Structure formats: structure tokens, C-alpha cells
Amino acid sequence: MVTLGKADLILVNGQFHTVDRENPVAEAVAVRDGKFLEVGTVAEVMQHHCDGTKVVDLKGHTAIPGLNDSHLHLIRGGLNYNLELRWEGVPSLADALRMLKEQALRTPSPQWVRVVGGWSEFQFAERRMPTLDEINDAAPDTPVFILHLYDRALLNRAALKVVGYTKDTPNPPGGEIQRDANGNPTGMLIARPNAMILYATLAKGPKLPLEQQVNSTRQFMRELNRLGLTSAIDAGGGFQNYPEDYEVIAELHEKKQMTIRIAYNLFTQRPGHELEDFEKWTDMFTPGQGSDFFRHNGAGEMLVFSAADFEDFLEPRPDLAPGMEDELERVVRHLVEHRWPFRLHATYNESISRMLDVFEKVNRDIPFNGLHWFFDHAETVSQANIDRIKALGGGIAVQHRMAFQGEYFAERYGIEATRHTPPVAKMLETGVPVGLGTDATRVASYNPWTALYWLVSGRTVGGMQMYDHSARLDRDTALMLWTQGSAWFSSEQNQKGQIKAGQLADLAVLSKDYFRVPEEEIKGIESVLTVVNGDIVYAAGAFGPLAPPAIPVLPEWSPVVKVPGHYRSAPPQAARVGMSVAHHCSGPCGVHNHQHDFARTSEMPVSDDNAFWGALGCSCFAF
């Protein structure tokens, strides 16, 4: 035990679940210079107290290592976060449409209202998509773009006008512009079979100026901190160009304003010129180059465009191009020669089989020899291919896309086919490294607790039971994959992922005891105190006075001003107390001015503290 080091921060009287088998549970931790100094009993930790030490009493709260999303499009998502209205977790379509209408009134020309990913029609009480008529009624004049998973986008008439889609606009390759009986676009764009039409249309929208992109990225990181996230591996992404789209995150790193650690992969943007991109980048970077907050992590998730098999389960499985292997081999051979780690998007087992043929061929000539590489997604990977991945020393980064698409998958392939899609338990039994993540923001939600709920319960966000007991994970295992497991995918397994002396001091103190609450309550967990590098970056509730200063949202009309991220449901009693304190017009009943007759006939959810208007703090907002 270290007895001489003095701590900068001490947290006591917590239930620290450390993900360290040698010391699985602790009462207290001491932090110095951004790393854990001591993890143990209160008496052991308080030996490191000195006059300058900040001491925080956790009063029995559960604490865990900071969560690490092994596949998040944080850099791209940050640039756009302040532009986007979030429907994540919203319980009814009626509330979602009210949110849309309110934001349309606040959004100035020429800006759009954008709902970009993170939701499913099955999460709504109505269990359906919005109609184009409903969207046009909610926003008759302001352009609206609503992205649903990888399968479709809905545009109102104003958006069709500004993007220029008319009767004479041809369907692009791989996509369809739905038309009415007269051949005019209806506003529905369909990915058939890939999502390029959706992303290309979204890219036509106005961008934020640089100053507001910086603010937007900081807001997104603060939202992730609220959910207990402290690290992410950025998977690049379509229309995320290097170096121009990395200027904002580089500025935040230089100014020491990052509150999420990022390891980033480089994603080629030029079909037919992928090898040229990687030849240039391997001359510029060494894997691991950077700091503990912002470091290079290799190539991917796109290595060659011919290897992309988008997971639109409303459409048949796509077959990859016949020449894919030759193109992929040239890139992988170059990466292995330069000892660059790589990741590759692969949804279907059929794609994975062909990709593994390439990897095995390269390995015979240039041994991988411990090089970290992995598949992303792998929903339908077979046991035979899991064995092949293990033999090559690879891993699998799994995301909760099936929590949003399980119903569609079951409709196409049958409920039995969903039972092990993806087969996470089998991956672990085989000994393959597994890390967990979200693939946010354009498809699934960035909320790690939605993913943990899915893994533990086996249910989608719509409540469909996908997995039986054999395919579900216990809570400790699921947490391990979100912490220590994900660290392998940035080659940082000895630096982060555990509450352990010598590791980076990243942790989250939870609003509820993840290990004991009913399964349905897992998805509502948040952090009440998030620590990154030994610094408190987020605090709420009883720990609110410890929070860093709030960052004003820019621009002032941003959806984040009114809807600050993922839908959050407060405990009923706490919410009602908060409403009556903040708004004297409300009492214990939670109804504005006690106007029960009006409330009973109103369409507004005036007394529901978990509905849209109530979530703003008071039903006054409804009138």
C-alpha cells in the first residue's frame, strides 16, 4: 500500500464496483495527478488526505469505472449535436410531434429541424411511424429532416423544396425517392439497399459556424458525461473528412476542454482511392500517437467501400461486389505492413466469411502477430467465423443496434433467428475480445444504459423479448464489456476500464444501484457525479454544487436549449417536488393552477412529469 502520496481527490462511503477481480468492491478511492492512488477501505484511503485534498462523501451511492463506448461517432455527432432534436426515449409519438412543432417555430430560416437517429417506432405508445401529413402539419414552413435508422428519411414539403427534389429528379444508385401517382416526391426517401441517399440529403443542410461547432461538441460531451461515459473510440464516418472535420476536437484538446477521452480511427472517404488515403495517413501517424485524451487508433471502420454491407433489415441482405476481396487485400496488406490497427464494418456472416478469407491470406504472408484488429457489429456471425477471428487474434465490437431493429429483423428472418443476434455470449465463451458500444448517433441512441438494459434483459426498446436466458448477460459481465472490455479496442487495457491503483481516474457515481434495481429501471440510470482524469466534469442532484459551470448553448434557438439530450424520466415524487418548488402555480397534484377540469379535456400531458411538457419542469409550458 502506498502511504506517502497525497491525494487531490478522495471519494468515501461509496459502493465502488471496480471491475478488478483482485479487489472487486471498495469503500473509497484516492486520486492524484489524474490516476487512482488508492482503492480500498475508508481508513486506507484517508491516509492520503492532506490540507489541499477535496473529499466527497458518496453517502452509499454505487460507483463504477467510467463507461467506454467502443464504437461512437462522437466527432461527427459533436459538430451537429446542437442542430438536432432528440427523440431518444420519448414515450409517445404525440409528444414527439409536439416537440417537432415547437422547435419548428423556434428555428430561423434557412436552418432545418433535424431528428437524426436514436429512436424507433416501437418505442412509442402508438407503435408506429409519424406520417408525412403529420410532419407537414407540425412544420408547414420550416424544413424538416427525420432519419429513422438506416432505412428511411422523412422530409416535409419545405425540405423537399430546399434540397431540390422534384418530379424530374432521378433515383440515385442504391436509393429511392418515393413518389405519388403523378410522379412527384412524397417526402419519403428509402435506403435500397444502402443509406447513401439519406446521408447525402442530410449533408445538404446548413452547418454551424466554427464557434458554435465547438460549443456543440462540448454540449455533446457533457450529455455523455451525464450518462456516465468517460471514453469513446470514434469510428470515423461518412462525410467525416480528415483533417477539416477534426479541427474542432483538436482545438478542444489543445485548450484542455475535452471531458471525454477519444481514440479515433480514420475512415476513407473516396471510393476507388481508399489505398491512397491510407498510404498518406500511414506516413502521417503512428498508432497511439497523441495523449490520454486524444489519440490515433488506426484505420476504419470503412476500409474499402466495396466491403460495406449496410444493416437495413427491411431489405434483403446485400451481396458484396465480386471484386471486393482484391480491393480489401491491398488495403489490409498495407496496414499490416505498417502495424496499423484496423476495424471493419460487417453486419452479416456471409460478408465476414469473405473478409476473413482476405485476412487469412494476408496473415500467411505478413503475420498479424498480435496486431489489434476487429470487426464492428457482426450481428449474424457464426461460431465457425468466431473461431477464425480468435485464431487471427481479432476482436468484435458489438453495439445495441438490435435493440432498435430487432422487430424488423424478426419480421424478415423469424423470431428464432434473433435468439443469438449478435451471439455475444458465444463470443465470450470462445475467448474473443468483446467491447460494447452504441454506433450513435445516426442509428442507435448514444445512451449506454439502453445498451446495458438490452444485454441484461434481452429486450428491444419496444419491449420485444429477443434473447432467452442463455444469450443474455449478467450485470457484472455486461458492465465489464462496457469498461475493461472496450479498452482493448484502443490498446489501453492496462490504462483504463477498472477502478484500480495506477489506472486513469475515470468513474461514474450512479443515480440508482445498477446491480439491484429491477431490469426495467436500468435504462433510466444516469450519473450523478462523473469524474474524468480526477476532475469532476458532471454533477447533479445532491452533488450538484460540485458541478463545473454550465456552458450556455449556442445558437440560442438550438433544440438543446429546450430538449437537452436523451429523454429523462425523473422519479415521480422528486419530479413533483421540483415542480412545486420551481413553479408556485403547481402543487402536489402536479396540475397547473389545479385546473383539473381543463387538464382532463386537454390533449397536453399536463400532469405527467415524465411526458414532454412535464419534463421541462412544469405543465405551464403547455399553455
PLM feature segments, named:
Residues 2-12, 17, 21-280, 295-351, ...:
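Divalent metal-binding segments
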Residues 7-8, 14, 38, 337-338, ...:
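In a subset of proteins, long, contiguous C-terminal domains/tails are tracked
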Residues 79-81, 164-166, 353, 407, ...:
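Short, function-defining helix-loop hinge/capping sites that tune catalysis or transport
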Residues 116, 147, 399, 508-511, ...:
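Residue-level recognition of conserved beta-strand edge/terminus positions
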Residues 172-173, 280-283, 437, 494:
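Glycine-rich, charged/polar anion/phosphate-binding loops
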Residues 252-255, 282-294, 366-368, 389-393:
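Acidic (Asp/Glu)-rich catalytic clusters
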Residues 274-288, 398:
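Substrate-binding cleft/loops of secretory-pathway carbohydrate-active enzymes
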